[in-house]
Every structure is written in C-alpha cells, then in structure tokens.
C-alpha cells in the first residue's frame, strides 16, 4: 500500500545539557523504534529529519512531546512510499547550523519577525522589499521564490560574508528571508538585525510549510524544493509547476540532481538520464576518465566501451562546433 511511511522534519532551539550523552541515548531510542534519518544535537538544541512508518513516527512525536523541552516542537510531516534514508545517524555538533560567528546568535533572544505563509506571500509583493534565499546555490538552482536573490555561496557559513559584500543591495529595504524548514533563518535573521538591518522578517516553518499551506498553496514558488535525503526534492507550488533547473551539460529544463561519478569530485549537477549516460556522469573530461569513476563501475563498462563513448562524445561536440 502506498504512503505507509512518513518523513518528519523538525527543529527546536532549546538548551540541552550534556548533548553528547543525549545524542548517544537518542540514537538508541531511534533505532529501537525502527526509524532512519539524520539528527543533529547541540547544546543549543536539536535538528532532525527522520523517516518511518506511520506508527513509528507517531510514537516518536509522542515521546518527544512528553519531554518538557520539546513539548511545543513543530513537526512537518510528509507522506512517503518508503524510508527517505538508508541509516540512522544522531550526531553531536557545536552548532545546529554552521555559521561560525564570533558572537553566536540565540534565536530565543534575537530573531527576525515570523511571517505565516499568507503574510509572506503578501510581503513578497510589496515595494522596497528584498527576498533573500538563505540556502546554498545548488538548492536555489533547483527552485526558489520568484524574484529572490541568489547568494553565491556553497555553504551556509559563507552567507554573512556575502551579505557584507552586498550590503548596498539591502540597505533601507524590507528584508524577507526563507530556507527549507526555518532553522537557518532563525539565526540568519537574528544576525541581520544585529548587523543593523532593521526590517527583517522570516518565513515561519520555511518552504515546506509554505507549500502545504491550504491558502497560498505554494504560489510564487518556481521549481522544486531541495531536501537533504534520498528524495532529493519535493514539490511546492500546487497551482502551477515551473521548471527553473537547467541541465548542467545542455542548459535544457531539468530537475534531476546527480552526483559526479568521480568520488573525489562528487559535485552535484542537474542532469537528465540521457546526459548522465552520454557523459558517464562526469562533470568534466577529467572526471569521466577518472580511474574510480563510479558510473563505469556501476554499469560494468570495459575500457573499450568507455573509450567508445568518449570518442562518440568528442565527435558530437566537434559536430556541434562546426
């Protein structure tokens, strides 16, 4: 039967004593329940995505809410046809989201104004408003709010420097910020306020909540939302689907992410199935001929077959240029 599984996305900024021990105990608890997923635990709180059956996820939410620290924690729930992860990991970290600020931000003390989906939808359309995507470039490239700024960053910790370098774009504007589930914006919007930006708001519950809201139904979102599990992406806009992703090799509309087959590169690229085969899932010629190319290994290709494909590719590229 379809959709017997669920994926839970959640976070909570709350003080956790002895987070290392908590992480160890929590891993056992999750494994005993039969869950799979990835959970980060820090002194400042918890951030997780787990998958399991309806019964397993219900038990998990019930147990978590029975702990006074997590009794008001919001769980974002997605139906799924199976597990979204291969294993169960609970890891201790210094920070739930890595900003590495000299003076850390506690979102319970300083954060941007929370906007519910309808409020965010309306605010995006107002004058003197700038919408800043608080995610990484590869997340933006798969989908984003219409007109949102794409910070040129590969990791969240690079965002403060990018903001400082582009301060003139934001000064005197109303700033709206958003991320997948809301956790990055809790800190980022607080940091913006600390930097002197006065009018800062964040999408409460993130893109995931916006896409499920019965009123806005994901409107003004183009593309899909990147997620950090085996689903890779989830739909957001229930009214219209606009593909914004572009194939790495041809620039054609595409929403399929793969990792470069060279394990030393592992770059994420948007790529059609056809082009994955044509380019041996290598983002460059060097990656295609790499001795440890995983595509070659997975498909059991001989050296002769690899050479044949590379020659064909060379001919196609030569023909396209002439």
From Swiss-Prot:
Q: What is any one GO biological process for this UniProt entry?
A: tRNA modification
Keywords recorded for this protein, A-Z: Oxidoreductase, tRNA processing
What SMART domains does the annotation carry? RHOD (SM00450)
- Active site residues per record: 179
Q: Which Gene3D superfamilies match?
A: 3.30.70.100, Rhodanese-like domain
Q: Name one Pfam family in it.
A: Rhodanese
* E.C. designation(s): 1.14.-.-
Per the database entry, which stretches of residues form a coiled coil?
none
Q: Which domain of life is it from?
A: Bacteria
Entry keyword annotation includes tRNA processing: yes
Q: Where is the Rhodanese domain?
A: 125-219
**Which reactions appear under catalytic activity for this entry?**
uridine(34) in tRNA + AH2 + O2 = 5-hydroxyuridine(34) in tRNA + A + H2O
Q: GO terms for molecular function, please?
A: oxidoreductase activity, acting on paired donors, with incorporation or reduction of molecular oxygen
Its biological purpose: Catalyzes oxygen-dependent 5-hydroxyuridine (ho5U) modification at position 34 in tRNAs.
**Family according to the record:** Belongs to the TrhO family.
Q: What's the protein here called? A: tRNA uridine(34) hydroxylase
Please report the organism this UniProt entry assigns to the protein: Bacillus licheniformis (strain ATCC 14580 / DSM 13 / JCM 2505 / CCUG 7422 / NBRC 12200 / NCIMB 9375 / NCTC 10341 / NRRL NRS-1264 / Gibson 46)
Gene symbol of the encoding locus: trhO
